[in-house]
């Protein structure tokens, strides 16, 4: 089952976890290094995650959801979706 419940952008709906992470990171004008610093990993790890060369641990996945959920509260939450949905419902991930 792909995420589409909260997604308002047809181009983004149905994409995989890595695409969603990259999309949100870029929407928030955050570099890979900045995201890595916030979750305690290197820029290279974020790059590998976004390019499908690395599957995050449950802990890292949780940390990423916390960063994006906090950031989304500062803006228009309606145009985003909950990051937890990506990790729970992304069939390509499992």
Describe the role of every protein-language-model region.
Residues 29-48:
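Short alpha-helical DNA-recognition segment
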Residues 19-34, 63:
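Short basic helix-loop element that most often maps to the first helix and adjoining turn
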Residues 14-18:
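Short, leucine-enriched amphipathic alpha-helices that occur as contiguous helical runs
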Residues 22, 26, 40, 51:
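Residue-level detection of the helix-turn-helix DNA-binding "recognition helix"
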Residues 1-13, 66, 73-94:
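Short, charged recognition helix plus adjacent turn
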Residues 61-68:
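Hydrophobic micro-packing sites on short alpha-helices
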